[in-house]
Regions:
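Glycine-rich active-site/cofactor-binding loop and its immediate structural neighborhood
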Residues: 85-103, 107-110, 114
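Terminal, membrane-proximal amphipathic helices
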Residues: 1-89, 114-261
């Protein structure tokens, strides 16, 4: 069974979104300076602060996804509304820098998750079901290179394959026992896997906001790029999942890898 012409166009669009320039490159273009400069202005304890903020944000996102996300029907996603909320939240991060991250990031992450769920619904996902909820959380791992990645092995399908077992174990645990024991190994492993990738992008955001004179306006713009990135990842991710519901998954991956962008 071949893939319809319109669906090939959608697949190409998804690949364009998913394999786009990195978050760091986009932030550097905004600032007009390499993002590495920002790391020079972070305190010695910044890695621990980012790790704690990232884990806290993803734990909150997991709770939000499992307990509150549903199938309210909307034909389109409210990308602009969520973007405005994230921009407003980012202004505080730009003003107060790293100390504000532990407060600002969980709020921004929840706003982004709402937007991701909105995009998922617009691509035909049933968000009341557990598997699509976990797929929404999976978006936070897209577009960030983990320390365990080797060279170019960071493409979309490679990341999904790397996370597959961890996601499956967490989904099975939640299906049986819910979130009653949040320190359960399956859930801890899921948060750790997501943190290893999402944390890289949070570090880049923190470094950008640490650059002197970035201010509230700069912080707001950085958050705009931050949510833009994850909205793009979500759109590409859920387009592919929609196509996988229509065609053989291996066929979709083969066609994806053949496409030039």
């Amino acid at each position: 069974m071949g893939i319809a012409k319109d669906d090939i166009s959608d697949l190409r669009y998804a690949k364009t979104l998913l394999e786009n320039p990195s978050l760091a490159a986009r932030i550097s273009n905004l600032l007009g300076t390499p993002i590495e400069k920002g790391f020079e202005h972070l305190p010695a304890t910044w890695k621990d602060a980012v790790q704690r903020a990232t884990e806290k944000s993803l734990e909150k996102a997991l709770n939000f996804a499992i307990r509150t996300m549903n199938d309210k029907t909307k034909p389109d996603s409210s990308d602009k509304t969520h973007k405005i909320l994230a921009i407003a939240t980012g202004a505080g991060g730009g003003t107060f820098g790293l100390p504000a991250l532990t407060i600002e990031l969980p709020v921004t992450t929840t706003i982004m998750l709402r937007s991701i769920a909105d995009i998922a619904r617009s691509e035909g996902e049933q968000i009341s079901l557990l598997e699509p909820k976990i797929a929404c959380l999976e978006v936070f791992a897209l577009g960030g290179r983990s320390k365990s990645d080797d060279g170019t092995e960071t493409g979309y399908f490679v990341v999904r394959a790397a996370l597959a077992r961890t996601i499956s174990e967490a989904a099975n645990y939640i299906a049986e026992l819910g979130l009653a024991r949040e320190g359960a190994p399956a859930l801890v492993k899921l948060i750790a896997a997501l943190t290893s990738r999402f944390g890289i992008m949070v570090s880049e955001k923190a470094a950008a906001q640490a650059i002197p004179l970035i201010g509230a306006a700069g912080g707001a713009l950085i958050n705009k790029i931050f949510i833009d990135h994850f909205q793009n990842m979500a759109r590409g991710h859920f387009i592919i999942r929609r196509l996988e519901r229509c065609y053989d998954k291996d066929l979709i991956r083969q066609e994806y890898e053949k496409l030039d962008i």
